[in-house]
């Protein structure tokens, strides 16, 4: 059983989340393509146990192209051939930051999640072709609670906050208990403003090693 179970059970029963889930279900029943598929909306919580979290990467909302999103931020399913631009830029930075990192031909980041990298989007659903279409439905409140829960129950976690959206979201993180790495978003619009060269991946591993923890193998 996941150690997220009690938290999820309690939070998903709250009135605001019932409204969110009802709206998403209604849109699906009307024939609207909502991503990720229903059984993958909470994939981040099954991929990474609370007690295993060592790193948190915050995204915005899921990819809105067909067959891409599967519940882990920035990640796409293995069969996706055309990688999203932000993920390509993440790989470029990894190649310059981490010795021997080979840029993959796929964008499936499940192995990061299995090593304790919690890949959380701020908003957990989106409609096809409509970025931010499920903004302000209640997901933001839910993911605020998730971050607070991690902040309370874990220590020494490295929060990677790319872009103003993630940095605003991370304002409540206790920097005395956790580590924060902040910088521009990897999207093509901002990657050249300081995302390239941020070296957040090697910095994360240095922070983990300073705590006596195993570094992340970023190769996927």
UniProtKB/Swiss-Prot annotation:
Its EC number is 3.2.2.27. The active site is at 61 (proton acceptor). One of its GO terms (molecular function) is uracil DNA N-glycosylase activity. It catalyses: Hydrolyzes single-stranded DNA or mismatched double-stranded DNA and polynucleotides, releasing free uracil. Its main location: cytoplasm. It is an enzyme of class 3 (hydrolase). Keywords: Cytoplasm, DNA damage, DNA repair, Hydrolase. The keyword Isomerase does not apply. Coiled coil: none annotated. It comes from the Bacteria. The keyword DNA damage applies. GO terms for biological process: base-excision repair, AP site formation via deaminated base removal. One of its GO terms (cellular component) is cytoplasm. It is found in: Cytoplasm. InterPro entries: UDG_fam1, Ura-DNA_Glyclase_AS, Uracil-DNA_glycosylase-like, Uracil-DNA_glycosylase-like_sf. SMART domains: UDG, UreE_C. PANTHER family: URACIL-DNA GLYCOSYLASE. Excises uracil residues from the DNA which can arise as a result of misincorporation of dUMP residues by DNA polymerase or due to deamination of cytosine. Belongs to the uracil-DNA glycosylase (UDG) superfamily. UNG family. This is Uracil-DNA glycosylase. It comes from Pseudoalteromonas translucida (strain TAC 125).
């Amino acid at each position: 059983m996941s150690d997220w179970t009690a938290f999820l059970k309690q939070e998903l029963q709250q009135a605001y989340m019932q409204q969110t889930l009802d709206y998403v279900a209604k849109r699906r029943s009307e024939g609207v393509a909502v991503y990720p598929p229903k059984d993958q909306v909470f994939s981040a919580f099954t991929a990474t146990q609370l007690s295993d979290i060592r790193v948190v990467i915050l995204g915005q909302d899921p990819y809105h192209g067909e067959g891409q999103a599967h519940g882990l931020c920035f990640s796409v399913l293995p069969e996706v051939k055309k990688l999203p631009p932000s993920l390509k830029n993440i790989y470029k930075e990894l190649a310059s930051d981490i010795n021997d990192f080979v840029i993959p031909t796929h964008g499936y980041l499940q192995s990061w999640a299995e090593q304790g990298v919690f890949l959380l989007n701020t908003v957990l659903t989106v409609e096809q072709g409509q970025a931010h279409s499920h903004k302000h439905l209640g997901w933001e409140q839910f993911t605020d609670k998730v971050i607070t829960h991690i902040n309370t129950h874990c220590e020494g976690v490295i929060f990677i906050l790319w872009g103003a959206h993630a940095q605003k979201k991370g304002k409540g993180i206790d920097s005395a208990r956790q580590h924060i790495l902040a910088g521009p978003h990897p999207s093509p619009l901002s990657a050249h403003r300081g995302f390239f060269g941020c070296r957040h991946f090697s910095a994360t591993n240095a922070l983990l090693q300073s705590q006596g923890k195993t570094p992340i193998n970023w190769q996927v």
